Amino acid sequence: GDVYKRQPEGPHTSAEWKIWAYSTAAPSFISAECTVVDTDGTILREGTNGWTAMSGNPNGAPSDPENGWKDPHEAMPMVGDAAAFAWAQGFMTGTVPKNDVDGWAWMLHGDMGEDNRMYLVTDEEGIAKAKADGEWIESGAHLMLFPADPSTLDGQTTDFNSGAPYVMFSGTEYAHLMIPVEGYY
């Protein structure tokens, strides 16, 4: 409905804005009942469906902390199930994710860009190299599959321009499938 699409009035530092921005990274039938967590771990809204929404920006804080994220795209929110967040926890702490089941996560607001080959490239030199190599992708709306066994993605394309689902971080323990949806390109 309208609440799903309409940005709330007020500052981007408010709980209301963050709940809207983070939860709308998934379709409304998931976002309406998901838990929403702030970047500091504070639960902004308790959910009931087993899905969680939070900012996925690896910088952890807005470029303008006083005024909050510029928009949902800068926040890079992700709405994922428990297995997706177990994967994300491993990813962010540099440990190997251990899941018995595949994880799923939505990022309908896209992201600010990634080196498709190597994770957590955030320095200017690394970004410039990825761009020069044609491996920098600023993703639009997508769904992600975090396989319990990343080797199940072996042989899938890594070509993010093909329009087909593609593997990001191929050959690493963090390999996952990016599934573009309408608005990706």
Model-derived regions: residue spans:
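A short linear-motif detector with a strong N-terminal bias
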Residues: 14-16, 31-33, 83-86, 121-125, ...
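Beta-strand-rich cores of mature extracytoplasmic or soluble domains
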Residues: 105-185
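Extracellular/luminal recognition modules and glycoprotein regions
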Residues: 9-49, 56, 62-67, 161-177
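Residue-level detector of short, conserved catalytic/binding motifs and their immediate flanks
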Residues: 49-51, 143
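Short, small-residue-biased leader/transition segments that mark boundaries at the very start
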Residues: 1-4
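A residue-identity detector for tryptophan
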Residues: 17-20, 51, 69, 87, ...
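Active-site-proximal beta-strand/loop segments in catalytic clefts of secreted hydrolases
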Residues: 54-56, 148
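Mid-length scaffold segments of soluble, non-membrane domains
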Residues: 59-127
